[in-house]
From Swiss-Prot, chain A:
Transcription factor that regulates the development of root hairs. Transcription factor that regulates the development of sperm cells. Disruption phenotype: No visible phenotype under normal growth conditions. The triple mutant lrl1, lrl2 and lrl3 exhibit very short root hairs. The double mutant drop1 and drop2 fail to develop sperm cells. GO terms for molecular function: DNA binding; DNA-binding transcription factor activity; protein dimerization activity. Expressed constitutively in roots, leaves, stems, and flowers. It comes from Arabidopsis thaliana. Induction: Repressed by heat treatment. Residues 136-149 are annotated as: Basic motif. GO terms for biological process: microgametogenesis; pollen sperm cell differentiation; regulation of DNA-templated transcription; root hair cell development; root hair cell differentiation; root hair elongation. The lineage of its organism: Eukaryota, Viridiplantae, Streptophyta, Embryophyta, Tracheophyta. This is Transcription factor LRL2. Residues 1-23, 95-143, 203-225 are annotated as: Disordered. Residues 150-185 are annotated as: Helix-loop-helix motif. It is found in: Nucleus.
UniProtKB/Swiss-Prot annotation, chain B:
Residues 27-76 form the bHLH domain. One of its GO terms (cellular component) is nucleus. The keyword Heme does not apply. The lineage of its organism: Eukaryota, Viridiplantae, Streptophyta, Embryophyta, Tracheophyta. SUPFAM superfamilies: HLH, helix-loop-helix DNA-binding domain. This is Transcription factor bHLH153. Keywords: DNA-binding, Nucleus, Transcription, Transcription regulation. It is found in: Nucleus. PROSITE patterns: BHLH.
Amino acid sequence: MNSSSLLTPSSSPSPHLQSPATFDHDDFLHHIFSSTPWPSSVLDDTPPPTSDCAPVTGFHHHDADSRNQITMIPLSHNHPNDALFNGFSTGSLPFHLPQGSGGQTQTQSQATASATTGGATAQPQTKPKVRARRGQATDPHSIAERLRRERIAERMKSLQELVPNGNKTDKASMLDEIIDYVKFLQLQVKVLSMSRLGGAASASSQISEDAGGSHENTSSSGEAKMTEHQVAKLMEEDMGSAMQYLQGKGLCLMPISLATTISTATCPSRSPFVKDTGVPLSPNLSTTIVANGNGSSLVTVKDAPSVSKP
Amino acid sequence: MEFSRDAGMMMENKRNVCSLGESSIKRHKSDLSFSSKERKDKVGERISALQQIVSPYGKTDTASVLLDAMHYIEFLHEQVKVLSAPYLQTVPDATQEELEQYSLRNRGLCLVPMENTVGVAQSNGADIWAPVKTPLSPAFSVTSQSPFR
């Protein structure tokens, strides 16, 4: 009844006053009704509305509404106080958030400051390095050292051209190749020199070979023939290339006369070297041909091809 | 308080990063010095070895050793050319085949593995040629061969 009586006076003054304003007020009242603390306030305020309803004038009604609001607020001190505290607490969060953001900005500023300080520390470190690297020193000691390095580099390049496997870039490996090649060349020269020393014995070697003419000629492998062909061709063109080729193959150039002498010297005593003696048998025949050629007799030269043909 | 603590942590992290950078730089420098020292020692040893082969009584600085090596290699090439010339000159013109023209055996030369050649080069040439001069008497040759071996 009380609630219905309250509703009716609100509806009655609406035609008297402006309808939209009253509608807005009604909406506001509805929102207030929807809030939780309102029912408790309604229960507490049950006797005052009846006394207010006695004067039916609109003006009084407005005053009554305002009075109700004013009275409601102090009556519900606890609830509005809680609401206010809640509002402050909720408000404090955004207040703290900007404080937090302020802190972040401070940390960022500190980060930038430290970055700038780091940059400042880095700059003096890089500056002397740049100077040391880029600057062309002009003192005589530095110039002399530079010339020495350039001279060594030029000579190292020249040696690379003379040495097989000259494509290595490591200085230590390059020197190893040079050392091995020099040793190989020394060995080659010594072997050829030994044959020169034995030149006087060519006649005796011919005699021994004539006695050994009955030996069968063993055919060498095609690969060996190709290697010999390549070496002979290179020796005609460039001795340096031929020597590099031989070192790469692990072979050494030796006169057949020297090889024959070595095989005959070792043949009678050591049987394990029979296999080795078998290898230079074919050189015997070629040596015979060459010996005939060395005889400087045209007739013998003609005989040599006839012998080789069959 | 929480934000101030976070700021402190950030500062500590940055300091750690800086220290790591410094340690890495130090390691890099130490590696360079170590490797450069090793390289210098290796190169120095090889230069000494090359000098012993090329010019035992010559100058010892790197540039001089390299120059002597160049000259010595060219000299050895010339030596091989001169020593092999007698064999190369005896080219049989009668044969027209290119393969035979470039064959070593027609010229009195053959290829021997370096392993078998080292022993020959180390020995005295006279010992090898001596037995050939006395093939007439087998008994004498046998007796003569025994003292050489």
